[in-house]
C-alpha cells in the first residue's frame, strides 16, 4: 500500500495511479531504487522520490530520502551508487530535493559541492598548460560548466542539472555566488548550442564537423534556460518542437516536454504518442514529474 495522499493525485491524473503504485513497489529493501531491477542507484532514487513527493506520497519517499542521506560523501557530494567513493554530477539531482526533507546541513553541503565544481577546461591548470602550448582557448570554453565526474570536461547534461539546483536554491535564499554560477552556466549553454539550434551532449564541433542536436539534451538545456529570452533560445525552441513531433523515446519526450513547459511552449493538449513506453524507472518518474508540472507543481524549480 502506497502511503500518503496518492488518491488525490490519481483523481487529477487517472493514468498515474498504477504508475505510482508500481514505482513504490519497485523500491528495494534498502530504501533506494534501481534503474530497472537489482542494485539501488542514486539517480533513479532521486527521480523516484521527486515523483512520489509530487504525488503527495510520504512513506516510500521518506525511506528513499533516508537512503540518499546515508550515501553522502565526506566532500559533501553524492556518488552514483553506494560503494563508489567519488562524488559525481548526480549531486545536482540530490540538491533538487527539499532541504527540509533531505536535511538542511546535507543539502547545504551539496550546494557547496556544486559551487566548487567546474569542467577541467575551465581550471587554471588546464588554461596555463594550453597557454604554454600556444593554444588559444575556444569560444565555447570561455564560460565554466559542470562535468559528469570531477577532473573531466563540462557537458550539457550535468551543466543543465546544476543550473536547476542552484537556481532553485537562489530563489529560496538569494546569494551572489549562486546567481553568478547560474548566469555563467547559462552562458556556457548558449555557447554550446548547435549551429541550427538545440544541443548536442558536448562540443559545438567535433572532428571538424558541426555537431547535431539531440532531443533529450535540448530539453534539458531549455529547462535550465527558463526565463531567458534570446534569439538563441527561440531557435532552440523551434528545434524542440520539431523533435517533439518526431521522436519516440520516452526519455527524450520527458525532457522535451519539461523544456517546452519552462517557456510556455508545450502545445496545448499534447499527448505522448501511442506505443512510447517508459523502459526505466527514471523514465517513469520523469513522466510523473511532467504531469505534475502541467498542473503547476514543478519540483525542478519550486
Give short role names for the model-derived ranges:
Residues 1-302:
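Preference for long, amphipathic alpha-helical scaffolds in soluble/luminal domains
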Amino acid at each position: 500500500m502506497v502511503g500518503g495522499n496518492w488518491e488525490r493525485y490519481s483523481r487529477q491524473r487517472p493514468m498515474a495511479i498504477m504508475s505510482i503504485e508500481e514505482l513504490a513497489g519497485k523500491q528495494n529493501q534498502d530504501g533506494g531504487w534501481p534503474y530497472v531491477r537489482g542494485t539501488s542507484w542514486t539517480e533513479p532514487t532521486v527521480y523516484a522520490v521527486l515523483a512520489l513527493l509530487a504525488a503527495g506520497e510520504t512513506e516510500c519517499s521518506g525511506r528513499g530520502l533516508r537512503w540518499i542521506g546515508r550515501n553522502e560523501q565526506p566532500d559533501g557530494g553524492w556518488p552514483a551508487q553506494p560503494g563508489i567513493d567519488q562524488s559525481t554530477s548526480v549531486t545536482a539531482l540530490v540538491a533538487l530535493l527539499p532541504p527540509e526533507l533531505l536535511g538542511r546541513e546535507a543539502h547545504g553541503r551539496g550546494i557547496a559541492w556544486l559551487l566548487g565544481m567546474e569542467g577541467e577546461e575551465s581550471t587554471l591548470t588546464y588554461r596555463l598548460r594550453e597557454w604554454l602550448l600556444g593554444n588559444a582557448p575556444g569560444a565555447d570554453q570561455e564560460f565554466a560548466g559542470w562535468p559528469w565526474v570531477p577532473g573531466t570536461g563540462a557537458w550539457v547534461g550535468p551543466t543543465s542539472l546544476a543550473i536547476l539546483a542552484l537556481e532553485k536554491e537562489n530563489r529560496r535564499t538569494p546569494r551572489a555566488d549562486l546567481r553568478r554560477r547560474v548566469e555563467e552556466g547559462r552562458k556556457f549553454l548558449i555557447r554550446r548550442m548547435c549551429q541550427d539550434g538545440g544541443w548536442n551532449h558536448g562540443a559545438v564541433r567535433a572532428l571538424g564537423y558541426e555537431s547535431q542536436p539531440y532531443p533529450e539534451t535540448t530539453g534539458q538545456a531549455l529547462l535550465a534556460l527558463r526565463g531567458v529570452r534570446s534569439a538563441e533560445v527561440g531557435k532552440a525552441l523551434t528545434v524542440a518542437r520539431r523533435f517533439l513531433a518526431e521522436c519516440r523515446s520516452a526519455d527524450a519526450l520527458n525532457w522535451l516536454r519539461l523544456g517546452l513547459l519552462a517557456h510556455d511552449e508545450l502545445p496545448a493538449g499534447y499527448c505522448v504518442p501511442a506505443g512510447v513506453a517508459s523502459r526505466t524507472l527514471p523514465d517513469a518518474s520523469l513522466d510523473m514529474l511532467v504531469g505534475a508540472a502541467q498542473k503547476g507543481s514543478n519540483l525542478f524549480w519550486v
